Every structure is written in C-alpha cells, then in structure tokens.
Amino acid sequence: MTNRGGRVLAIELDGVTKRFVSPSGASFTALRDLDMKVVEGEFCAVVGPSGCGKSTTLALISGLEPTSLGTVRVYGEPVRGVTPRVGYVFQRDAVFPWKNVVDNVAIGPRFHGVAGHDANDLARTWIQRVGLSGFEHYYPHQLSGGMRKRLALAQTLINEPRILLMDEPFSALDVQTRALMENELLEIWAASRASVVFVTHDLEEAIALADRVVVITAGPGTVKSTYAVDLPRPRNVAEIRFQPRFVQLYEEIWNDLKDEVLVSYERSKQRVAVNP
C-alpha cells in the first residue's frame, strides 16, 4: 500500500477508537477517531499531554491491544495480534534480570529457531553495535541506566524489525546520557531505515530526532496536527537545538501543543477538587 506521494505505508490507523472498561464497569475512551500514517523509513515522533493515549496508540500498532473501532494496518495488513515485524522499546526495561547481556540479546533469535551458537554470535555483533563490548557477561543490575537502554535496543533490533515503537525510552536518563543515546539511536536508525514511532513528552527531543511530529489532543486522543521537521541529516541532537529553524519549529509546535496541555491540566485540577 502506498500513500499519495508514492511511498510505501508502513503504518496506518484509520478511524481508530479505543475504550477501556474499569473493574466497576465504567467505560473510558482513550482514543477517538484517530487517523495516522507513517511511511516506510520515516522517523515519526508523537507528542501530547499526559493521558492523551500516546502509549495506547503504540499498543494498538504492536497488536498488544485490539481497537474498539477502526482499523490498524501494518504494511497493508490488518493487525490481529502481535507481529514479529514490529519491535517495541518500553519506557521501563523489559530485560530479564537473571540473564546476562549475551543471553538477553540472544533471546529473540533463539525464539525464532536460530541455533544457540549462531544466536550468541549474532548477539555479540549487536552488543558491539550498541557500544556494550566488554560487558557481555554482566547482568542487568550491574549496568548503568544508559547501558541498560543499550541492552534493550540490542535486544529489540537484533530481530531486525521493520517497525520500531519506542515509548519514552530515554526519559529516566540524565541529560548527558540521554543526548548520547539519542545520537546512537539516530545512527542505528540511519543504518536500518526501520519505520520509527517515538512517543515522548519532550518536544525538543521530538524535533531533534524526527522527520515529522504528530500532536495528539487531550484525551480522548486524536491527531490535532502534524509538522514536517525540515532539519538536515545527519543530526547531532545537542547541537541542532541552537539552529534558528529548530527554535522556529519549537515555537510553532509548542503554540499548538500548549493548548492541549492546559486542557489536560484543568481537567486534572477538577478531578482533584471532586476527589480531594
């Protein structure tokens, strides 16, 4: 499937609504009539206020959650359950604490039938690519936060996903480590050209990384606007923030996003007033 520009559509959400039901039976609508497209090889960042359904959007694309209404397609095929073409890097590490770095990274290939020795060799290749050489036999609790994120990236990318979903993967890191990880991510993405959907609360991070930024409304979430990020590549995420065009993009997108942040904030104050 292609879009009007002739590029292959990697992801398509068409009229998607997602409702959840609480234990008491109350219905909560996280997303309503959301339309979104990501073309092959695109780096798309998604921003919006807390609780607007950004993470839910990733869960629908991955197949971890079904839609209530509408359709999600990956390369033209409706999503019906988890697909191996999609990799997912969560906000919190999804590594196995009882396994060392090599065994954590090799899990994916082994699951898909690659022999143990070959899986370990492939794991070592990816360990080197993400900058963890020398730590092959360390356990997750022996690694720094940045190293654990590198481990999570290797664990996901070793499976060569055509689509990479990332849910605030660097939010818990310090500023310096975060900038290093963002640059490493861009280098890995440039080599793989996977289609990326990157959820973040940090608008600067979104602009520094992405080809396009999607703004989601206060919940129930739907797409409010999209912005093309016409900054040159390759990028250094720390340096590009000082470019005049970066500042201009930030002002344009923030003027749009802040209205939704204020709506979300006022709603949260009302909930506190009702339930002190």
List the model feature ranges, each with a label:
Residues 47-49:
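The feature captures the beta-strand-to-loop junction immediately N-terminal to the Walker
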Residues 62:
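Helix-to-loop junction immediately C-terminal to a conserved catalytic motif
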Residues 70-82:
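Conserved ABC transporter NBD signature motif
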Residues 99-107:
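Short coil-to-helix segment of the ABC ATPase nucleotide-binding domain corresponding to the Q-loop/switch region
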Residues 110, 117-135, 187:
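Conserved ABC ATPase "signature" region
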Residues 138-141, 159:
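Conserved signature/switch motifs of ABC ATPase nucleotide-binding domains
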Residues 153:
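Hydrophobic anchor residue at the start of the ABC signature
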Residues 164-167:
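Catalytic Walker B motif of ABC-type/P-loop ATPase nucleotide-binding domains
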